[in-house]
Amino acid sequence: MGGVHPDSTETQSLLGQAQTGDRQAFDELFGRHRDALRRAVELRLDARLRARVDPSDVVQETQLEAFQRLPDYLERRPMPFRLWLRKTAYERLLKVRRHHLKTARRAAGREVALPHESSLLLAEQLLAGGPTPSQHAAKHEVARQLRTALGELSEGQREVLLMRNFEGLSYQEVGYVLDIDPAAARKRYGRALLQLRQRLLAGGFRESEL
């Protein structure tokens, strides 16, 4: 996870065709990233949004927006295509959140919990060692506390955690998506992990368990 992988020769070829207005070439290229984008969206939909938003709809809207913005992207080429799609999907999801949770945020504050599955996956990564029986039982308690602690993080901190731990992005790649320097992404990730660990320790977990 140390750097940025450039676009493949095949991707560049399809982008060249799409630049001439070949919608089929763009759709073929987007299709290669569809599953990854859907997974990224699913990881970020909490219970309030899941009842209202279909991840496939967000991905479809991302595809339409990306095609409309493709000429600008091809003119500037600010980042590899897959990261640009990831950034476009992230921005689309933020718009969906603002639209659907505007009233909920006013009523319940700014906390946004990750889906339970995301909390469990992060709990597995934070627990030291292998999946012993005690750790298996503790995982769900960690996940419960993580859901609360993650809701207290800033949006940017949560995103860095997801991009690093679930999507395997490097700090430079995270920086592209979030429009921050790689060094800032590294610091943000470190602060987020520290805050989560402090919360778990305050909740009764031992340092050796984390």
Spans of features found by a protein language model:
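Structural recognition of an alpha-helix C-terminal capping motif at a helix-to-coil junction
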Residues: 57-64, 79-91
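Arg/Lys-rich amphipathic alpha helix in sigma70-family domain 2
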Residues: 72, 87-112, 116, 124, ...
